[in-house]
């Protein structure tokens, strides 16, 4: 069973939740600090705390319900005000400025992320002013042992309140919850900017999905040991590098990590060429 988690104070998360509640019959329960909505297909949990500070929320919720995976329904904030749908895994490569713990990573859910992205792609024409983009690993919670990812609407109050945008996200989430295909190629991504354009293209057009992704701005904190940890948490078989932003020092770290973890290193250009979706 998959669990959607939203925050009481998150406008976009509430908007997505309200749409999800129209897709099935739910039993409502108040337990501890949570409000639960239980259906035969999936569960929803609402918390009072901000999601980025929700470390160990999987352990807290496991006292009341059985579930295998978390989909965090959330807002995305940025100063540029872009209209975007985003997806990413949480965790910190370095300091913990926005929740979680330093140098700590949540366990990703790459298969569900991929199924969500493909379902979302089919609906983007309903909101042509929006674009989809991956984000790299950032912010809390980092202390999540169940597979999880963030599914976000950005980037201002206007988009968070957009009913149709939330409807598109909720429908894609439901498709991902129902999806049976769980054998996509899984990689950890290294390189690029925060919005990871090459990883985004790979998610949309190839047979690959991602667990953790590390932007160029995190390279000063990236070690082979940390990268091995990310590969294992992601259950990845590959590391994909954005070859235009990875220097020789980082390539050395990547190759060392790949040897220890027993995975293959691929360049993003090769992946886009050789692993296209049919």
Curated annotation (Swiss-Prot):
Function: D-aminoacyl-tRNA deacylase with broad substrate specificity. By recycling D-aminoacyl-tRNA to D-amino acids and free tRNA molecules, this enzyme counteracts the toxicity associated with the formation of D-aminoacyl-tRNA entities in vivo.
Keywords from the named record: Hydrolase, Metal-binding, Zinc
Assigned EC number: 3.1.1.96
Catalytic activity: a D-aminoacyl-tRNA + H2O = a tRNA + a D-alpha-amino acid + H(+); glycyl-tRNA(Ala) + H2O = tRNA(Ala) + glycine + H(+)
Source organism of this protein record: Archaeoglobus fulgidus (strain ATCC 49558 / DSM 4304 / JCM 9628 / NBRC 100126 / VC-16)
Keyword Ion transport recorded: no
Cofactor (UniProt): Zn(2+)
Pfam families reported for this sequence: tRNA_deacylase
Family assignment from sequence similarity: Belongs to the DtdA deacylase family.
Cofactor binding note of this UniProt entry: Binds 2 Zn(2+) ions per subunit.
Molecular-function annotations in GO: D-aminoacyl-tRNA deacylase activity; zinc ion binding
Assembly and oligomerization: Monomer.
InterPro entries: Deacylase_DtdA_archaea, DtdA
Annotated protein name in UniProt: D-aminoacyl-tRNA deacylase
One GO process term, biological-process aspect: D-amino acid catabolic process
Transcription regulation in keyword set: no
């Amino acid at each position: 069973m998959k669990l959607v988690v939203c925050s009481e104070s998150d406008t976009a998360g509430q908007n997505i939740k309200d749409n999800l509640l129209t897709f099935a019959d739910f039993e409502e329960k108040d337990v501890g600090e949570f409000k639960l909505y239980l259906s035969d297909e999936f569960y929803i949990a609402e918390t009072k705390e901000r999601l980025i500070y929700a470390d160990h929320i999987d352990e807290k919720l496991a006292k009341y319900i059985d579930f295998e995976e978390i989909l965090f329904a959330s807002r995305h904030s940025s100063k540029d005000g872009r209209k975007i749908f985003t997806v990413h895994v949480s965790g910190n490569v370095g300091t913990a400025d926005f929740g979680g713990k330093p140098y700590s990573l949540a366990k990703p859910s790459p298969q569900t992320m991929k199924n969500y992205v493909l379902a979302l792609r089919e609906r983007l024409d309903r909101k042509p002013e929006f674009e989809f983009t991956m984000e790299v690993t950032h912010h809390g919670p980092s202390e999540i042992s169940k597979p999880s990812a963030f599914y976000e609407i950005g980037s201002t109050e206007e988009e968070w309140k957009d009913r149709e945008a939330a409807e598109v996200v909720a429908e894609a989430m439901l498709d991902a919850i129902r999806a049976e295909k769980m054998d996509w190629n899984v990689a950890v991504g290294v390189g690029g900017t925060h919005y990871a354009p090459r990883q985004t293209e790979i998610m949309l057009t190839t047979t690959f999905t991602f667990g953790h992704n590390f932007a160029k701005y995190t390279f000063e904190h990236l070690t082979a040991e940390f990268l091995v940890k990310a590969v294992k948490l992601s259950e990845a078989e590959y590391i994909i590098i954005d070859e235009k932003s990875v220097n020789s020092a980082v390539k050395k770290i990547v190759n060392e990590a790949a040897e220890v973890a027993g995975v293959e290193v691929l360049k993003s250009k090769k992946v886009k060429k050789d692993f296209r979706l049919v």
